Amino acid sequence: MRVCVTGGTGFLGGALVRRLLAERVPVRVLARPSVRADELESRGVEVVRGELGDPAAVARAVRGIELVYHVAAKVDSAGKAAEFFETNVRGTEGVLAACLDAGVRRVVYESSIAVYGLVRNGEHIDENTPYDEFPKLRDFYSQSKLAADQLAVSFARKTGLPLVIMRPGIIYGPGKALPLGLLSFNLGKSNFVFGSPDLHFPLNYVENLIDAMELAANLDGDQLREFNIVDDEDLTLLRYHSTKSNVDQSRTRFFPGWPVLAAAPLVDTVMRVLPLGGTRITKHQLERSLQDRFYDTRRIRQELRWAPKVPLEESIRRSIGTHDHA
């Protein structure tokens, strides 16, 4: 089977490409002209140069391909709204259209649990939970991922394109900073986290996520499938930091979230004035971050028979020292 990976030079896409190469799967990657891909080419990866917004380049990338992993996205916080929508929404639309034209057997699209809105504290969020009703109150990344997810669902239903949408949480692993919390910072070995230590923490170790992506690629049937995925539904901030402390001897202090919420209107006003691009902090955004959000993953565990192979402590151990914490 010939496979194409968009975003194959990024964190998740790069890890996926390495996995496929280890499995001796022929891989093609769509890479931006500005990104170095010498190492991939030296390992036998076919590299197609082009932007997601270039229909000709995308068509070349998926021509003759059976399976496409669409992982490419603009994920950083800086930038204008148009930049996020060009890559994450119009880019996704272009990839799906090209895959339909090329007769691709299946597309696995990497979305995000960021598409969901406010819920009652502790309420289970599954694949039937509505999208966020107030996307304009979110940062540009979240707005664009929500719009792209909606577009992908609509496209698959209208055209019959065999599509699997994966909605992971916070992805980490070797080469990427270990997460601390949705509202957090660190100074040396000391971590400072705002919010209750009992809040659920939706994490995905990169290799566990790739296991699920490969299972999704081999699903029977052509119908649209949607999967929420986090490694441990029951993981809390307290248990995560306790486990992390056992590995790296770090110390974590928790602070109440209400002062952050109280300051949100002022901070958002300041950020609207300052030239900080896509960085936004709104009351709505902070309320989501301080809610206890339980992501229900029964569907992916039952239908794909997926379970994380790398446990939390081992995943932290593998990630320690590969990147500065953030």
Task: List the predicted regions and their residue ranges.
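Conserved Rossmann-fold NAD(P)-dependent oxidoreductase catalytic core, especially the SDR/UDP-sugar
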Residues: 90, 94-140
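N-terminal Rossmann NAD(P)H-binding glycine-rich loop of SDR-like oxidoreductase domains
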Residues: 3-23
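Amphipathic terminal alpha-helices
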Residues: 295-303, 307-326
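NAD(P)H-binding glycine-rich loop region in Rossmannoid oxidoreductase-like domains
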Residues: 35-41, 45-90, 98, 102
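Mid/C-terminal beta-alpha module of Rossmann-like enzyme folds, strongest
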Residues: 215-280, 297, 317-318
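Substrate-positioning beta->alpha
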Residues: 147-148, 176-181, 194-217, 224-228
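Flexible, glycine-rich beta-alpha linker
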Residues: 116, 140, 161-181
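Active-site Tyr-X1-5-Lys
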Residues: 136-164
